[in-house]
């Protein structure tokens, strides 16, 4: 499992094609991450065309569809998505709340870190981050 772009984003369509070649070459390679590249742009569309169970790259802030997006909780679209069960609040952040009670009293987190969770790279459901 490779987590892409902690400090950057996809710079080109050619770079997306590189990851397509790596996925074809290495059968057990899995990739996840986030991108600000939106659909309707060459890079965003290349990412969308590669998206699969082995290439779980979420688009940040674009909730046009029903899945594979990431959004901050302070965005007005996030609470309705969570309420309608179209999005999941990141389990490592469930107790970081403002006026909303997202966790049962006394629960700090549902899982201690991303490595013990895996929702970002195993579910197509939207993910909402309380702090991001």
Spans of features found by a protein language model:
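Class I S-adenosyl-L-methionine
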Residues: 1-132
């Amino acid at each position: 499992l490779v987590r892409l772009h902690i400090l950057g984003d996809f710079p080109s369509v050619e770079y997306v094609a590189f990851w397509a070649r790596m996925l074809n070459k290495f059968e057990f390679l899995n990739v996840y991450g986030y991108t600000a590249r939106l659909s309707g742009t060459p890079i965003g569309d290349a990412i969308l065309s590669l998206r699969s169970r082995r290439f779980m790259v979420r688009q940040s802030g674009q909730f046009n569809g029903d899945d594979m997006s990431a959004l901050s909780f302070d965005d007005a679209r996030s609470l309705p998505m969570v309420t309608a069960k179209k999005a999941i609040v990141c389990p490592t952040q469930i107790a970081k709340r403002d006026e909303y009670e997202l966790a049962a009293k006394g629960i700090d987190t549902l899982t201690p870190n991303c490595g013990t969770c895996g929702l970002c790279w195993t579910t197509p459901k939207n993910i909402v981050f309380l702090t991001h």
